[in-house]
C-alpha cells in the first residue's frame, strides 16, 4: 500500500471540503449539505489519521510524501491523531451548536457557510503544520492557522465577536517577523554547514548535522521562535488574556487582585 499517497489524501480531504463548501451558494443550498460535507471530511480525516498513526507506530518506519516536503514519523503521528480525534469531536458537537444558533436567529446562512468553510480550512492548516518537513512551509502553516481561526472567532459578525477576532489577530501576529527570522537563522546556519544548501530547509536533512550548528545562533533562533509561538501556545510569560475578555478597562483594584 502506498502510504505516502494516504498522507496526501489526509491533507486534501479538509482542503477539498473547504473549497467545495466555499463554492456553494449559501442562500439556495440547504444547511444539511454543508453539514454532510463537513462531517464526511472530518470522519475521513479521523480514519486516515488513526490508520497512519497505527502503521507508523507498529512498523517504526516514517512515511514521506511529495518527495521530502511532508514527513510522518512516530512523534508527528501523535499530533496527527490528536488533530483527527479532536477535529472530529468538536466538528460533530458543532452541528447541534450551529443548528441551535440558527434556530434562535443568531446565525444567518452565510455565517453558517463561513463557519464550516473555515473549520475545514483550520483542520487543513493544522495537518500541514504537523506533517510539513519544510521549515519555511511549517512557518507558513502556523500563520495560516491563525488566519483561518480569525474567521471562526468572528463568524457571528457581532461587535463582540469581531472585537475578539481583532484581539486574536493582534496577539498572534505580533511576533510573525520573529518567527520568520528564527526560521531563517536556522536555514542560514544549516546552509553553511551542509554540502547541499537546497536540503537545508528539510527537517530530516537537518537532524544529522545538528551537532555542527552554531550553538549561540540556535539559541537566538529558539528565542525568536518562542516569541512567535508563545502567544499562540499560551506559554508563560507570553500568554495573552482570552480574546473574548471584556473590552472595557477594569478598575485598578480588581485588576491587581489574584484570580
Where are these regions (language model features)?
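Short hydrophobic/aromatic segments of transmembrane alpha-helices and their interfaces
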Residues: 1-2, 12-13, 58-62, 118-121, ...
Amino acid at each position: 500500500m502506498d502510504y505516502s499517497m494516504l498522507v496526501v489524501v489526509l491533507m486534501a480531504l479538509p482542503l477539498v471540503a473547504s473549497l467545495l463548501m466555499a463554492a456553494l451558494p449559501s442562500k439556495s443550498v440547504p444547511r444539511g449539505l454543508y453539514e454532510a460535507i463537513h462531517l464526511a471530511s472530518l470522519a475521513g480525516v479521523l480514519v486516515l489519521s488513526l490508520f497512519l498513526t497505527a502503521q507508523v507506530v507498529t512498523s517504526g518506519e516514517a512515511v514521506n510524501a511529495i518527495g521530502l516536503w511532508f514527513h510522518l514519523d512516530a512523534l508527528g503521528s501523535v499530533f496527527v491523531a490528536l488533530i483527527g480525534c479532536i477535529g472530529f469531536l468538536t466538528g460533530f458537537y458543532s452541528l447541534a451548536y450551529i443548528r441551535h444558533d440558527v434556530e434562535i436567529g443568531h446565525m444567518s446562512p452565510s455565517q453558517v457557510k463561513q463557519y464550516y468553510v473555515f473549520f475545514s480550512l483550520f483542520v487543513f492548516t493544522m495537518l500541514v503544520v504537523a506533517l510539513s518537513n519544510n521549515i519555511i512551509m511549517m512557518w507558513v502553516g502556523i500563520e495560516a492557522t491563525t488566519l483561518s481561526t480569525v474567521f471562526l472567532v468572528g463568524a457571528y459578525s457581532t461587535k463582540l465577536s469581531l472585537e475578539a477576532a481583532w484581539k486574536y489577530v493582534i496577539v498572534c501576529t505580533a511576533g510573525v517577523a520573529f518567527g520568520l527570522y528564527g526560521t531563517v537563522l536556522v536555514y542560514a546556519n544549516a546552509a553553511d554547514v551542509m554540502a547541499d544548501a537546497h536540503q537545508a530547509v528539510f527537517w530530516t536533512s537537518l537532524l544529522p548535522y545538528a551537532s555542527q550548528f552554531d550553538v549561540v545562533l540556535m539559541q537566538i533562533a529558539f528565542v525568536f521562535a518562542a516569541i512567535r509561538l508563545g502567544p499562540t501556545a499560551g506559554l508563560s510569560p507570553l500568554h495573552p488574556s482570552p480574546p473574548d475578555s471584556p473590552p472595557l478597562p477594569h478598575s485598578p483594584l480588581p485588576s491587581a487582585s489574584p484570580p
